[in-house]
């Protein structure tokens, strides 16, 4: 059997929608767990939409129009650490978590198109960051995400899940994050500093303004 088409995938799902075009909320699954941010009684899914005609272009799909066409700005407020091949930005536009840091290679690629040398270094960088994030007093666990539906250039999100706040465990962490009050930027900087230092120690490079305020 060949891998199925998206039309077949969609049709199988669409067969389960009710008269209002919605799938039922899976109360026996994660929506019913204690880590889910919303109460099931007041919840309904949005009407299911069919596949679009094409995948939309993402920001920086063309390398010439991507941020990586310009050198790293060492004065950038969001820059936490960088070296000759990688950079880490802090989420200064707002974070409800103790730390949210974006790791990107400076060479233009996505996860599926990484040059072998970039792929080889990625694991070690993620390990350094996760260890330093889990060393923060307000963090219980480091989480790692790769989405890439908005920007074409590879960016991995490392998040610090607040320590002992067990409701915030698992994949709903980002949904919680959107609803949490913002962490002050000076607190984000002091949490980012040990992570930037660990990166500089293990991978060279420089600590940026976001970890120095
Ligand atoms: Zn790029």
Describe the function of each predicted region.
Residues 1-98, 206-213:
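Active-site microenvironments that recognize anionic phosphate/pyrophosphate groups
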Residues 47, 162-213:
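C-terminal helix-cap and adjacent tail motif
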Residues 101-125, 176-184:
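Short histidine-centered catalytic/ligand-binding loop motif
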Residues 105, 147-175:
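Histidine-centered divalent-metal-coordination microenvironment in nucleic-acid enzymes
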Residues 120-136:
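Active-site helix/loop of acyl-thioester processing domains in fatty-acid/polyketide metabolism
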Residues 131-138, 201, 205:
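Secondary-structure boundary elements
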């Amino acid at each position: 059997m060949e891998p199925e088409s998206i039309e077949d995938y969609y049709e199988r799902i669409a067969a389960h929608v009710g008269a209002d075009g919605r799938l039922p909320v899976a109360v026996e699954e994660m929506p019913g767990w204690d880590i889910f941010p919303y109460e099931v009684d007041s919840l309904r899914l949005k009407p299911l939409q069919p596949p679009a005609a094409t995948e939309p272009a993402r920001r920086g799909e063309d390398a010439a129009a991507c941020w990586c066409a310009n050198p790293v700005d060492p004065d950038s407020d969001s820059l936490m650490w960088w070296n000759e091949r990688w950079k880490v930005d802090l989420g200064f536009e707002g974070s409800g978590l103790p730390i949210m840091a974006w790791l990107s290679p400076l060479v233009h690629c996505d996860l599926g198109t990484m040059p072998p040398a970039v792929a080889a270094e990625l694991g070690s960088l993620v390990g350094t960051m996760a260890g330093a994030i889990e060393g923060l007093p307000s963090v219980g666990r480091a989480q790692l995400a790769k989405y890439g539906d908005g920007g074409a250039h590879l960016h991995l999100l490392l998040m610090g899940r607040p320590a002992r706040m067990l409701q915030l465990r698992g994949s709903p962490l980002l949904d919680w994050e959107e609803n949490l009050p913002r962490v002050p930027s000076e607190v984000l900087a002091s949490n980012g500093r040990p992570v930037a230092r660990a990166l500089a120690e293990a991978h060279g490079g420089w600590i940026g303004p976001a970890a120095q305020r």
